[in-house]
Amino acid sequence: RVREDFNDGWRFHLGDVPEAYSAAYDDSGWRELELPHDWAVEGDFSIDNPSGTGGGALPGGIGWYRKTFVAPENEADRVWRLEFDGVYMNSEVFVNGESLGVRPYGYISFCYDISPYLRWGEENVIAVRVDNAEQPNSRWYSGCGIYRNVWMLKTSELCIPSDGLFCYVASMDMNRIDRTDRKSTRLNSSHQVLS
C-alpha cells in the first residue's frame, strides 16, 4: 500500500467550461496551482455576493481543476484509488473523459477506483468540476474548491481497504478497558473465488 500526495501540478479555471471534462481539452491557458485551494477567498468581499454575510460575503460559482500525469506501465498490476479529503461542493470527477461520479455537498471525503480508466505508460487527465453557484447554501463560510488534500492510493488487488478494519471495546471506565471478541474486517478483491 502506497499513499502519495497528489496536490502538485493542478490547473484551475474559474467559470464553467462544459468541454473541460475531455482529455483532449487544451488547459494550457489555465492557472497553475497546488492544492488545497479555495477560490472564494481570492474574490472580493461584498454583501451583494449571493452567499450573503452568513456565507462570508464571498463569491461562489463554478470552477474546474485539471491534472495531467503518467501512470507507469510497471504499476498496471496495482489498483489506483483517487482520494479527495474535501471538495466544496457538488463535484464531478472525470478520468480521461469518463465520469467517475458526482459527490453532492462537500463535507465528506470520497474515493474513486480509477484503474479501469488509466492509460498505462501514457498521459492521463483528471478533471474535477466544482459547483458552488447555488447560494446561500450554508450558515457560515464554506469556501469553494478542492479545499483539502488529494491522495493517490496504490494497492494490490487483494487488500484491506481504508477504514476496513475496526476494533470494538466492550466497556470502558477511567481505570479499565474490557476487550471484546467482536471484530470486523472488510477485504477488497477483484478476484472471483471458485469452490
Provide a role label for each language-model segment:
Residues 95, 177-186:
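Beta-strand-rich binding/interaction modules
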Residues 1-47, 51, 125-129, 133, ...:
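Accessory carbohydrate-binding/adhesion or oligomerization-edge regions at the termini
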Residues 37, 60, 192-193:
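Generic low-complexity segments that are intrinsically disordered, proline-rich and/or Lys/Arg-biased
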Residues 43-51, 55-60, 67:
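Mid-chain, structured segments of secreted extracytoplasmic proteins
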Residues 54-60, 170-178:
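Short, solvent-exposed beta-strand/turn "edge" segments of beta-rich domains on protein surfaces
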Residues 183-195:
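Single conserved hydrophobic/aromatic residue that forms the stacking wall/gate
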Residues 4, 14-16, 60-170:
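Accessory beta-strand-rich segments of carbohydrate-active enzymes
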